[in-house]
Amino acid sequence: ETVHVKNTGRCKELLIPGCNVYLEKSENPNRKTLYDLIAVEKRYDEIFDWGIFPLAFRKRMNDGKEKTLLFNIDSQAPNKVVLEWLKKQDYSVIKPEFTFGKSRFDFYLEKIDSVTGKTEKILMEVKGCTLEIEGVGYFPDAPTERGVKHLNELSDAIGEGYKSVLAFVIQMEGVTEVFPNVKTHPEFATALEKAKASGVEVWFLQCGVTEDTLEIVDVNNH
């Protein structure tokens, strides 16, 4: 059976022969493929030194007693779960797909400062992280010129009075932060450092993952 993989990345460390995957049946009977691949189990059978892993990841894997970890690889899921999460926060305005400059960002937000009463304008770009190496998340897993462009324009927006946020949705449990994948796309790593230096905030959105759900459970701001 041929299925559609709902991810534009490579996922080569996940989609290996013999791995367990989870499918979702399409509601479109006219599609070439009947199913979408939305999640995959990664095995950790041959880890000999769990001491190299971050504490949070070791705790999630019970110091190696757990042998598999579920990854959500649906590239459409991050924006959906972020929207649901944003609705539970104290934003007065939430606009998906907002155009600024030559880019379209995932969200435009407004929040009223409880002290000053002023309205804070926020641009947010969402990126899903599905690459984990030794308990740490990395992005991207394939070159993304669009991602570089977004970072540059997030930096520009700060000069025009916006707060700019890059939000990584971590699509596996136990991982608490995401680093730039220098080996795969050094330009993205450079752009990210410049963006952070200009004032762009980086948020790590930690998730609970099941076979058919993805839910934000914690947030780290950097």
Model-derived regions: residue spans:
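Residues at the starts of beta-strands that form the adenosine-phosphate
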Residues: 20, 120, 163-165, 201
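Conserved catalytic cores of phosphodiester-cleaving nucleases, focusing on short active-site segments
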Residues: 105-141, 154
